[in-house]
Amino acid sequence: MRMEHIYKFQHWLFFIGLGVLLSLSLSVKANDFEGSNDRRSIALKARSFVSINENRTALSRKLLLSPDIGDGTNRIGQDCSKDDIVLFQGSTNPLPSGVPSYTVEIFNSCVSDCNIAEIHVSCGWFSSVRLVNPRVFRRLDYDDCLVNDGQPLGPGQSLSFQYANSFSYPLSVASVSCF
């Protein structure tokens, strides 16, 4: 059941990302063609748009294939980073007392064999009316919360918890340790 939840979450994440990329692409194209009435200028802009994207694709493939580029863009086979931890937060049904409730999902999006531990989240003065399992998420100090009791989160693994407060806390990944 847990793996099924992870796969559904990964599919959901993929389709949202795809939708965002598609909408950005369409808005860029629409802005390029705006104000152009003549067919020749539209054709030239369309050709330049396509060639820019072809160059980006070629560059991306080159970065993936060349292991000697040391600028950090080639991440295949290298250590993980805090960017591999994706944190989602959304509102859920309020408590019977009317206090707003929120669900947080923390996901290791690393595609290679990387276990990420000691995940620290910037969380302000995080507190909750609803009890949050301290092994899953707990505040250590101001703006420092620990995820999964410091234990590793494997590639593709996620965990979630719910909290209740009069407002949602802005949560972001502060630091991680890679294994």
UniProtKB/Swiss-Prot annotation:
Keyword field contains Signal: yes
TM annotation in the entry: none
Signal peptide: 1-30
One Pfam family hit: TPD1_C
Any GO BP: response to heat
Disulfide partners: none
Key words of the record: Signal
The protein, known as: TPD1 protein homolog 1
Organism whose genome encodes this protein: Arabidopsis thaliana
